[in-house]
Structures are given as C-alpha cells and as structure tokens.
Amino acid sequence: EEISEINHQGKVGVFVNETIERIAEISEKAKLNFIQLHGDEDEEFILSLSQRLSKEVKLIKVFRVGETFNFQFSIFNSLVDYFLFDTDSKAFGGTGKTFDWQILNEIEIPILYFLSGGISLENIHQLSTINHQPLALDINSKFETEPGIKNLEKIKIFKSLLK
C-alpha cells in the first residue's frame, strides 16, 4: 500500500517464479510501472500474465548469462518490452559479479535491454566496448554502503564517468 502512494513513473516489481495471480495483484495494488521477471517464466506464462496486466505496465524478462547461456530468446521478442542481461548464479538475485559483456557483441539483440551484474567504477570503461549499448544500467551492490543503502557519492562519480 505504501508503494502505491509513491508518485513515480519507474516503480519496478521484481518477481522470481511467482504466480500470475500474485504478480497481477501486486502490480495493481502497488501501481507498478514495470514487472521484472527473474525466474523460469516461459512464453506461455508471459503471454497469460500480459493479458492480466494493465497495458501501461511494461514487462522485463531477465536472462542469466553464464558460460553455457543459450541465446535463443527470440520467442520473447514480441511478448516483453525489454530484456535484462545479468550474471548467472546458482541462486536467483544479484551476485555482484560480471559476465563477459563481449558476448553481447556476438548476438543480435532485437529489443531494448538493460545490463546488470557487477557493474562498478572499476569496470565502467568496459561498457564502451559493447556495440549495441544498453538502454539502462542496473547498478546495485557495488554502489551500496550496506545492503539496500545506496552510496550517493559513488553513484555521482559513476554518472559523471558515463558522460
């Protein structure tokens, strides 16, 4: 309920293997703008989910990129609004580690995407080597003083280095 009171155009709900009913309920109550799907959702699930959501809610499908990642994601092109590429791990959620971003230069990415996974001040220069630049960067643990607490000074430095 508190989230629904926030007047912001970038409210993102992050879900891992949740039911369609639960995602739709939370999306409506919280007045989410984006739904980020981090689990094992397939095309049938996403199609059913999109039919339950307001047309204004944008869907982001997360792909966890590792050494054996299969880039057969074309089935999702027309079902979601964005992709998000993150580092693969045994558990769901952030690891603070990067994957080899050069892999993105070897594939055609048909829709806008976000990049996540270990982005830091130390590796910011590597972002410029990606041919098809991401729409946005999902920075997190490398820019926190403790879990959930952002280091605004680091974020300001990062932002200035991106220019």
Where would I find each of the regions flagged by the language model?
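Conserved anion-binding
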Residues: S4-L115, I119-I124
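Glycine-rich phosphate-binding active-site loops on the catalytic face of alpha/beta enzymes
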Residues: Q36-D42, D88-G94, H132-I155
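Intrinsic structural disorder
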Residues: E1-E2, V80-F83, P134-L137, K163
